[in-house]
Amino acid sequence: ARYTNGFENVEGRLLGEESGTWKVDFYGSSASALKRDGSQLQQAAGDNEPEQLFDRAPIPVPEGAPIGASFERALYSAYMGGSWKITSGEGEGATVQFQADGQVSGLPGADRYALCLAGDCASMSNGNDSMWLQQNGQGNNWIFVRKGKELEILQAVNSALADEQPQFTPGARKWLLEKQ
C-alpha cells in the first residue's frame, strides 16, 4: 500500500480482510482500516486522521504512474481543463487547451505544464500559486492568479541570491486567459 500527502511518500503492508475490512499497517505510523462501501472506499477515523471517503478516479492513469498521478490528473482536469482564450499577451485570440496529463496546446512557447502542489516549489513561491511551463523539455516557473473564469500568468522573478534557494515573486503579466 502506498500513498502521498504531497510532502512524503508513505508505504505500508495490506493485511488480510476481516469481516469486509482491510487493515493497512504503515511503517513507522499507526494502522488504518479500509472498507468498501458501494463504489467508495472508506477509511476509518484513526489517531491521526479523520474518516475519509474515496471515489475511484474517473481519469485512468497508465500502469506504473507515480503515486498521486490520479489526484493530479483529476485536479488538472477540474481546475485547468477546457478551452481558454488568450485575451492579452502573445498569441492574443488563440485558444488554449490544458489537458489532464499535463499537455498544453495553443499557449505560445509551451507544450507541457505542471501545477506546483507541494514541496520545494511551493515553499519557493512565497504563498503565490505557481506552475511550470515548458517546451521540448526546457521551461521555467511562472506565477498564476485564477479569479473565476480569468487566469493571469505572470513572470516568476527570483529575488534570492545565487547561493540561496529561489524565492519567486510575481513579475510582469505574460498572458491573461479567459475560460470559454
Model-derived segments and spans:
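Short beta-strand edge/turn micro-motifs at domain boundaries
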Residues: 42-63, 83-85
